[in-house]
UniProtKB/Swiss-Prot annotation:
Gene name linked to the record: rpiA
Natural source organism: Bacillus cereus (strain ZK / E33L)
Designated name of the protein: Ribose-5-phosphate isomerase A
The UniProt record lists the keyword Cell membrane: no
Residues noted as binding substrate in the record, renumbered to the chain: T25, G26, S27, T28, D80, G81, A82, D83, K93, G94, G95, G96, K120
Gene3D superfamilies according to UniProt: 3.30.70.260, 3.40.50.1360
Annotated InterPro entries: NagB/RpiA_transferase-like (IPR037171), Ribose-5P_isomerase (IPR050262), Ribose5P_isomerase_typA_subgr (IPR020672), Ribose5P_isomerase_type_A (IPR004788)
EC number of the protein: 5.3.1.6
Length: 220
């Protein structure tokens, strides 16, 4: 069985009857959503908030009841993937382009469970390019200010055209030569740049990480 599938399906066991949950986006969250669809068919009663249009479509296909985050005060649990995670449960997310909605949903949840395969565990964040969501207006000015923090930047494309997020924004992917020693500081500095909507750094948000390894499930 695929390591992502092992982690994703195991995470679904943390979802209990009556919960309001956040559904993540990406190739690992896919397996959690598939498993939850199966459990809903078997009688599990939940309500879910999707973190992307892609996840919304999948949940609807599986008949998972969906709600708006505007209609609830908080969520019991969100299960989502990550592009990198360190030993302090700090994350880089946004490889799939849904980082803003993922962060809004995660910050509205009592618990955030991150599901990954062992290749995503790192000693220091930053090998994976850090996604930053920016508004399209004067985007080159915003990119220039991001570069002034010492990174190399690339405007994200899809099918040779500018990638547009579900929020009609753009994404700049950033590589920092010395990785990211203090993610919380970098996040604050990036957020101070006018035009930056959100960063893919998730700091002090994760409750637990479920890692699919060749030897089975490991929890952080």
């Amino acid at each position: 069985m695929d390591l992502k599938q092992i982690a994703g399906e195991y995470a679904a066991t943390f979802v209990k009857d009556g919960m309001k949950i956040g559904l993540g986006t990406g190739s690992t969250a896919y397996w959690t959503i598939q498993k939850l669809g199966q459990r809903v068919k078997e009688g599990l009663s939940i309500q879910a908030v999707p973190t992307s249009k892609e996840t919304e479509a999948l949940a609807q296909q599986l008949n998972i009841p969906l709600i708006s985050l505007n209609d609830v005060q908080s969520l019991d649990l969100t299960i989502d993937g990550a592009d990198e995670i360190d030993s302090n449960l700090q994350l880089i997310k946004g490889g799939g382009g849904a980082l803003l909605r993922e962060k809004i949903v995660a910050s509205s949840s009592k618990e955030l469970i991150i599901i990954i395969d062992e290749s995503k565990v790192v000693t220091r964040l930053g090998t994976f390019p850090l996604p930053i969501e920016i508004i399209p207006f004067a985007w080159k000015q915003t990119e220039s200010k991001i570069q002034s923090l010492g990174c190399q930047t690339t405007l994200r494309l899809k099918n040779n055209e500018t990638f547009i997020t579900d929020n009609n924004n753009m994404i700049i992917d950033c590589i920092f030569p010395n990785h990211i020693p203090t993610p919380s500081d970098l996040h604050k500095r990036l957020k101070m740049i006018t035009g930056v909507v959100e960063t893919g750094l998730f700091v002090n948000m994760t409750s637990k990480a479920i890692i699919g390894t060749k030897n089975g499930i490991q929890e952080l």
